[in-house]
Amino acid sequence: TAFGVEEQQSGNGIHCWKSDSMQIIGNSIRGHRDGIYFEFVTHSVIWRNISQDNIRYGLHFMFSNNDAYYSNVFEGNGAGVAVMFSREVTMENNYFEENWGDGAYGLLLKEISNSSITNNRFTRNTTGIYMEGVSRLQLQKNVFRGNGWAMKIQASCMEVNVQENNFLANTFDVGTNGSLV
């Protein structure tokens, strides 16, 4: 546990770069820039970690493919998790809680494809999931409770399959910036 105050003066709790087959299991990560940071990491698993009170992201994926994160807690971070410029990421049985503020999300997805989000809980976040440039995503059996927005799906997304999710007591359930013609 460390307690960084400013982003530029803090490091990441766990930082993996250009790695394969990593196993990040059973850690408590608190007070860093990003709790867990993956860049160019493949075929890896993040399981049963608690990442909270980090300045930026509880978990941050960049250019990382064929990875999975299961049964983690992301609470009170600048944003819970960001998955960017990645493909074939499995996100299952995680808790995204109390990620509040300007630009704060439970889960931020930017330019990802061929991925799945299943059996997660998004509770009391500014936005549960924000999607931009997402394609071929399966989003099912998740619970969205007490968020400002449960989901924001930008018009740049395509082939997003949303089914069997529960939306409870959110200010808004689903929004987009697109329109049908």
Please state what every model-predicted region is.
Residues T1-A2, M22-I25, S44-W47, D67-Y70, ...:
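All-beta strand scaffolds that present successive hydrophobic residues in beta-strands
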Residues F3-W17, G31-Y37, D53-H60, G76-A82, ...:
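Extracellular beta-strand/beta-solenoid scaffold signature
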Residues Y57, M62, N66-F74, A79-N94:
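Acidic, glycine-rich loop-and-beta core segments that form the ion-binding/anion-interacting portion
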Residues A104, K110-N114, N119, I129-E132, ...:
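Soluble extramembrane regions of membrane proteins in the secretory/endomembrane system
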